[in-house]
Amino acid sequence: MNVILLDKVANLGSLGDQVSVKAGYARNFLLPYGKAVVANAANTEVFEARRAELEAKLAAELATATARADKLTALEAVVIASKAGDEGKLFGSIGNRDIADAVTAAGVALAKSEVRLPLGALRTTGSFEIEVQVHAEVKAVVKIAIVAEA
């Protein structure tokens, strides 16, 4: 099934690309989520008329994501207090939700799905640099300091 993409789709293409995908992928994901339209003559004309509007929308999303990334990078180390043993090993761990909540409390909104912990949850005290993906093309680094509760 041929479709015209209305948004950037990972491993498929970007705005305006005409791609061939399996019918089930188009019917169950691309079309219901508004990421594509069926490639026929009528939809092609409508898309070409809306192309500038869609490109402006994508550019605006990228600009807001870049602004958020700058705010996140400008943050000083976000301190998270957690119970820990004598050697700095935490009782429990600090995960995506804990980091997102701490950064949001520091003043910049952050969703837990944007936090990237490739090595898993943090289990020791200390300072860490956490990668945050605010947009498909924009990443930021947030400094986290985990300290033992008194």
Swiss-Prot record:
GO terms for biological process: translation. PROSITE patterns: RIBOSOMAL_L9. InterPro entries: Ribosomal_bL9 (IPR000244), Ribosomal_bL9/RNase_H1_N (IPR009027), Ribosomal_bL9_bac/chp (IPR020594), Ribosomal_bL9_C (IPR020069), Ribosomal_bL9_C_sf (IPR036791), Ribosomal_bL9_N (IPR020070), Ribosomal_bL9_N_sf (IPR036935). Belongs to the bacterial ribosomal protein bL9 family. GO terms for cellular component: ribonucleoprotein complex; ribosome. Keywords: Ribonucleoprotein, Ribosomal protein, RNA-binding, rRNA-binding. Binds to the 23S rRNA. Transmembrane segments: none annotated. It comes from Shewanella frigidimarina (strain NCIMB 400). It comes from the Bacteria. Gene3D superfamilies: Ribosomal protein L9, C-terminal domain, Ribosomal protein L9, N-terminal domain. HAMAP family: Ribosomal_bL9. The keyword Transmembrane does not apply. This is Large ribosomal subunit protein bL9. GO terms for molecular function: rRNA binding; structural constituent of ribosome. The keyword Protein biosynthesis does not apply.
